[in-house]
């Protein structure tokens, strides 16, 4: 299959108009900016962004009420209807503010270009969820059959950045959902890459339930990896069964953390405790000797 033309070139015909409007301050020209009924604008079906912060939308809605919409949305006209290309957050906030109309720039663009613009607009947003960014990268790579190197040049990011973001897609669905719902950060998620699904979800439960920092998560993941790589032969014994099941270790960890800020990890046939708060260690020792 022949490779589609590079995405940057495919957008070249419409970017000059957008730049003219946004960068040169000409958006007040009557033939560019129109006032549309808020219900006339249909969401972009190719919008890769699925989750929007409610607090952020509320803040923007309040700003729109007080100052109006400062940056018009981009739309394309088709069969008497307007489809959103860029500005989903502004559209949602305007609806939240119960605005009857919205400022829009009508762009002359082919239907098949809508996905391209929506993806680029979202990729360039700083507040895009890392998982949504990874999915957008994946869609660009697959739709245009480009390499990560080519994509990195288009989005003006390093190839390492693109590769690291894409690795988030290897996480279990449960971890991906937690990242999408902002129950964990991208820092937490990156620590879990490379672990099997069961270990990912065990650590995920600890992150959420015990509010672990990224550093604490790294320590916990390191302990899991040490357990997996532990060579029993070096210690002169053959272990025929797991010393403690994963769910039992999780319950033990939960109890130790709640009472003594301790973490337990398996190392061969041993349970090793890591202390995170020295002041509670003495209480733990007294409990063990009582």
Curated annotation (Swiss-Prot):
Coiled coil: none annotated. One of its GO terms (biological process) is positive regulation of sporulation resulting in formation of a cellular spore. It comes from Helicobacter pylori (strain ATCC 700392 / 26695) (Campylobacter pylori). GO terms for cellular component: chromosome. It holds the Pfam family HTH_ParB. Belongs to the ParB family. The gene is parB. Involved in chromosome partition. Localize to both poles of the predivisional cell following completion of DNA replication. Binds to the DNA origin of replication. Keywords: Chromosome partition, DNA-binding. InterPro entries: Chromosome_partition/occlusion, HTH_ParB/Spo0J, ParB/RepB/Spo0J, ParB/Sulfiredoxin_dom, ParB/Sulfiredoxin_sf. GO terms for molecular function: DNA binding. This is Probable chromosome-partitioning protein ParB.
